[in-house]
């Protein structure tokens, strides 16, 4: 088989340099004669690792000093519950902006804990697009406003930050965290599962403004209580140390290659190259409006489910893995997160051209 490129939506590709580093010291971390998986999470060396990981992340993402960084577990789904348990206060309700599957799922979970209002901000006509993002006239009625800036299933991304006035803005950035620089100060909470751009599954990143910590409802489990986790250095329980270690290597690698300035340019080039080919093709079609096309998850169809299935099977056989679209929409999806090189996109386009030449209806 030729070189394999992994287009999985998550768990996703990890930088080869990171995997090689981990492989090289897997059984002898820091010349201790043991693996990082075997050392105490409260030992000197691991405590130094997590301190450096946070320092590197803060530098790469330009996180202000009045924000706390937590490394938790439970994935984004865990945060779907943790957010309302920690942030619902005197107003007693929150606003959820529905742009697709994951934002709707977050709202559904939050309803177990609070009164939730939901506004659909996506139009699914001939093209899928995001509607108006100005909620400053109503946001002060809510304890927070929640949205998902990148919907992996539909391939829809929201590039502008919603206007919520002085209200607390919460963002599920699981699929576009660290893909470009953002102004952290516009958000009250940012959370993300690790398995797309941060590292392997098992770690959940939470970036939260200091003043939002300490208001959890009394029945909040300690594992979901942000104040408890802050005071315990994100280690109220034994954390997934190997996943944390790999995330630390990713943060360090991002610094070494030039940070998010470089990553932003790389990601824009990858996405534009692929979308330009799709738009020029007579076989493939993307149904998302250009201004809302995801940089991370590129969806496309042939219009024939049988041909889509053939595409997935044949692409897999030549080392282009995990291109099958989500079961909700079908078709194909190329997830091109930070670790995907431009060469992977070029290899995909080369296959797409060959497949089109062989299968375009005459």
Predicted regions and their residues:
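Active-site phosphate-binding strand-loop segment of PLP-dependent enzymes
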Residues: 110, 121-177
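Conserved active-site segment immediately N-terminal to the catalytic lysine
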Residues: 170, 184-195
């Amino acid at each position: 088989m030729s070189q394999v490129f992994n287009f999985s939506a998550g768990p996703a590709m990890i930088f080869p340099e990171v995997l090689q580093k981990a492989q090289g010291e897997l059984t002898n971390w820091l010349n201790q004669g043991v693996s990082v998986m075997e050392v105490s999470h409260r030992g000197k060396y691991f405590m130094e690792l997590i301190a450096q990981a946070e320092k590197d992340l803060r530098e790469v993402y330009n996180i202000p000093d009045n924000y706390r960084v937590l490394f938790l577990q439970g994935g984004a789904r865990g945060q779907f519950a943790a957010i309302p348990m920690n942030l619902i206060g005197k107003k007693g309700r929150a606003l959820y902006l529905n742009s697709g599957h994951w934002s709707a799922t977050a709202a559904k979970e939050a309803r177990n804990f609070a009164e939730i209002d939901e506004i659909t901000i996506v139009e699914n006509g001939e093209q899928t697009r995001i509607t108006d993002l100005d909620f400053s006239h109503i946001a002060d009625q809510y304890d927070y406003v929640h949205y998902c800036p990148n919907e992996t299933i539909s391939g829809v991304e929201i590039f502008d930050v919603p206007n919520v006035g002085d209200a607390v803005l919460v963002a599920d950035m699981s699929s576009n965290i660290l893909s470009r620089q953002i102004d952290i100060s516009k958000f009250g909470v940012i959370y993300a599962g690790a398995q797309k751009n941060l590292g392997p599954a098992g770690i959940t990143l939470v970036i939260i403004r200091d003043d939002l910590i300490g208001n959890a409802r009394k029945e909040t489990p300690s594992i979901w209580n942000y104040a408890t986790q802050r005071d315990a250095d994100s280690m109220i329980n034994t954390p997934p140390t190997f996943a944390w270690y790999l995330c630390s290597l990713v943060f360090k690698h991002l610094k070494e290659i030039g940070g998010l300035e470089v990553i932003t340019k790389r990601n824009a080039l990858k996405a534009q190259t692929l979308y330009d080919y799709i738009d020029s093709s007579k076989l493939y079609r993307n149904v998302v409006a250009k201004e809302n096309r995801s940089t991370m998850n590129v969806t496309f169809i042939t219009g024939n489910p049988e041909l889509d299935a053939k595409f997935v099977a044949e692409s897999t056989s030549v080392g282009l893995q995990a291109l099958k679209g989500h079961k909700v929409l079908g078709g194909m999806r190329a997830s091109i997160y930070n670790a995907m090189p431009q060469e992977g996109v070029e290899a995909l386009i080369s296959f797409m051209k060959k497949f089109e030449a062989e299968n375009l209806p005459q």
